[in-house]
Amino acid sequence: MTNLPKVTIRDLAESGVHFGHKVSRWNAKMAPYIYGVHQQNRIHIIDLRKTLPLLEAAMKALYDVASQDGRILFVGTKFQALDIVASEAVRCGQYYVNDRWLGGMLTNWNTVSSSIKTLIQYEKILNDEDSILTKKELGNIEKKRKKLDKELGGIREMGAVPDILFIIDTNKEHIAVKEAKKLGIPVVGVLDTNSDPDDIAYPISGNDDSRKSIELYCKLAADSILAGIESSLTRSRVKDDELIQEKEGGIVQTKKKRMKDETEREVIVSK
């Protein structure tokens, strides 16, 4: 049974998910997800009865990828999302981009990988107690390291392009959406009333500006991913505990196979 986190329409309303943008800024493609207009403020009100099943489907998609040991990339570079995206991605052992999206981050992965190797090399140089470099040279390397770490620190351990993207504000992250489409990578995206739902495999209609709303989306995403990882671990334990019987001197002995990385993955789940 899928153990996904529970969420209600009340939870969505309390987090301000239903508040859209000014009517003048809307994208007509979002009409199916809009309940009406707040007459005093002239903003669209998002229909949370539509949002809830979309959110549940999106969280199930993240769960499924995590349960198959897939890579999940959180993307949110707007000010309100920076720290939330990073902390929730780290909490569930996944990856994030929260500074700016570098063109080619997906479609030119080899170059990005090379930059990550450079970052690691800089760190080795700076940590070398026997370095013969001058203080000025080390200072220049530290500046370069900081820049690379800010841009790539959240994906340095990813190892390959992700299996799915989780994006806050698909308008702002339109380059990420475009690159994902080119590579056939599905996108879970939070879509406000000014967004374009095209090319988003798992749309979540909702406020993409409110910090409280962003916290809710990211927490649910991380919890769904952790549930998927736990599901994967459970399956691994079942396979692990298949008994292999050996006869030695007429005595049946029982051995258990152990996964090499189980300890590390359990640490991730416990975070």
From Swiss-Prot:
Molecular-function GO terms, alphabetical: structural constituent of ribosome
PROSITE patterns: RIBOSOMAL_S2_2
Top-level taxon: Bacteria
Entries under CDD domains matching the protein: RPS2 (cd01425)
Keyword set, alphabetical order: Ribonucleoprotein, Ribosomal protein
UniProt feature coiled coil, ranges: none
Pfam families, per database record: Ribosomal_S2 (PF00318)
One GO term describing the cellular component: cytosolic small ribosomal subunit
Biological process annotations from GO: translation
Family under the similarity heading: Belongs to the universal ribosomal protein uS2 family.
Name of the protein described by the UniProt record: Small ribosomal subunit protein uS2
Organism name: Wolbachia pipientis subsp. Culex pipiens (strain wPip)
Lineage: Bacteria, Pseudomonadati, Pseudomonadota, Alphaproteobacteria, Rickettsiales
